[in-house]
């Protein structure tokens, strides 16, 4: 009996290689047991760095003794994009990954926040190299993440993203909701990205000579009156999966017919419990 080939998955994040979220992701993938795992992640937190990379100075990489069993682990003094560039262009240049996963981020990257996000920046970089990729983020705090049944869902997401054929590599921005009572998630919804974004007000915290130091405070979502499907799905305790097709702008290369086909294919393929009511009204 011929064994199915195992995926080669590159795992990165922006919270740092020691963060809880990336450890959870490794655990889920190990439980699913369909891929060989390679961790290349920042040594320190890189939140909000988007697609920044080390252009004007060197970056550094060193082997890392990862506490869970993986094929290899490397810590990078740099951004998530640096991690992907080093992994694809140097560390694994002779045998690149089939898929790049970034996360699980401590905090949401839904709506327009995906443009700020270094978690999402990593998957955009992977897409630029022709590799499908998925960003994963947990609303509020990683402590809200619900591990039950997530191994099968993560596997379904990975298999769909790799197997779906399109002229350009497919990426998804996946966000897990959080509720005050931590009630079980209802399912997963394929949506387009919303317009909401995190807004803060600069606050002066100190002055040293002519130099003034600021931080942002009163951070909250700026939303329009016409709430997006993504926002409503998360508010109603659904996981969201937003497709990102790389060629300059999200979805720029998809016709309405192609997008409808992608949505239909996703909804047929990516489920983890068929008894869930995916047609529940979000209103």
From Swiss-Prot:
Location within or outside the cell: Cytoplasm
Keywords: Cytoplasm, Hydrolase, Metal-binding, Nucleotide-binding
Function per UniProt: Nucleotidase that shows phosphatase activity on nucleoside 5'-monophosphates.
Domain of life of the source: Bacteria
Gene3D superfamilies to which the protein is assigned, alphabetical: Survival protein SurE-like phosphatase/nucleotidase
Coiled coil: none
Protein name: 5'-nucleotidase SurE
Needed co-factor(s): a divalent metal cation
Pfam families per UniProt: SurE
Family the UniProt entry places it in: Belongs to the SurE nucleotidase family.
Cysteines joined through disulfide linkages: none
InterPro entries: SurE (IPR030048), SurE-like_Pase/nucleotidase (IPR002828), SurE-like_sf (IPR036523)
Reaction equations catalysed: a ribonucleoside 5'-phosphate + H2O = a ribonucleoside + phosphate
Annotated Gene Ontology cellular component terms: cytoplasm
Ranges annotated as spanning the membrane: none
UniProt-annotated binding residues for a divalent metal cation: 14-15, 47, 105
Cofactor remark from the record: Binds 1 divalent metal cation per subunit.
EC number: 3.1.3.5
Molecular function terms, GO-annotated: 3'-nucleotidase activity; 5'-nucleotidase activity; exopolyphosphatase activity; metal ion binding; nucleotide binding
